[in-house]
């Protein structure tokens, strides 16, 4: 049995030093306000989860290519999250954006198996845990990846029966435990938020193949801000629990994806995956064809 709240307060007050007592008392109040988290459901192993219509929906099981399923299993293998940064790149039609959404869904699912999610990370119980989907404009985000994410969630039995969102709001996805999914277009949309996970789909920031409509450096600046915020909020006991994704088409050669590729060669926290159509499509799709 652990100590009662009164016993915890007494023990903490008894440890105070004479100097800076008011500051120390404020710290005591913060500590007793942080409740521990309890696991309320067993977390289904990733290999079972990704092939279950109950957890991923019929579309996830039947339409997510094996290439991406294998990647998702690698990210969450052995019952833990093995990377903090995921870079998905490849040609149009390879399913990389959809894969990114299912990676985020796995993170959401794992959090849903706990009571007092904030306590997992040493945060106060009323702390909001936020996910963000970024696009060039909020309007574009709402009608692209965020809308797809909402549609996927609404078709999954688990999120209908065990962890249901507020169906009266579609501009954000509000779940129990003060977990919320937002969309945004700039660093300003993160102000005041405890962001645990974000997706930046680079293709949404470009008007054409040259990327001339937006300063490509601003995308890198946004991503660096995301990394800083997520790691500072959700690093607990030396473990970084954040999960951030960059999704980029092979059409675009950007400094961000190039830098992340170079970093991935030596940084074990980054997973870089490049999909080619002949890797993705079912065997026989390109029979007797050659690629140069």
Segments (PLM) and residue ranges:
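Phosphate/NTP-binding elements of NTP-utilizing enzymes
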Residues: 1-292
């Amino acid at each position: 049995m652990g100590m009662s709240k009164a016993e915890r307060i007494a023990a903490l007050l008894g440890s105070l030093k004479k100097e800076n007592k008011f500051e120390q008392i404020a710290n005591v109040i913060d500590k007793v306000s942080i409740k521990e988290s309890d696991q309320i459901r067993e977390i289904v192993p990733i290999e079972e989860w990704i092939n279950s219509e109950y957890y991923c929906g019929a579309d996830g099981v039947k339409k997510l290519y094996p290439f991406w399923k294998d990647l998702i299993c690698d990210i969450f293998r052995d019952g833990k999250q093995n990377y903090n940064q995921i870079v998905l790149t490849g040609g149009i039609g390879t399913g990389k954006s959809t894969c990114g959404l299912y990676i985020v869904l796995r993170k959401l699912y794992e959090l849903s198996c706990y009571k007092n999610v904030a306590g997992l990370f040493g945060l106060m119980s009323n702390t909001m845990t936020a996910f963000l989907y970024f696009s060039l404009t909020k309007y574009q985000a709402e009608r692209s990846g965020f809308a797809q994410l909402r549609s996927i969630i609404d078709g999954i039995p688990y999120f209908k029966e065990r962890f249901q969102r507020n169906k009266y709001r579609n501009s954000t996805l509000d779940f129990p435990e003060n977990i919320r999914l937002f969309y945004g277009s700039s660093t300003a949309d993160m102000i005041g938020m405890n962001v645990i996970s974000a997706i930046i789909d680079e293709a949404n920031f470009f008007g054409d193949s040259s990327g001339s409509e937006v300063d490509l450096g601003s995308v890198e600046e946004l991503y660096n801000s995301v990394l800083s915020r997520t790691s500072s909020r959700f690093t607990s006991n030396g473990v970084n629990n954040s999960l951030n994704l960059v999704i980029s088409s092979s059409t675009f050669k950007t400094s961000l994806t190039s830098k992340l590729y170079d970093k991935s060669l030596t940084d074990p926290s980054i997973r870089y995956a490049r999909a080619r159509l002949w890797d993705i499509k079912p065997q026989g799709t390109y029979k007797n064809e050659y690629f140069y």
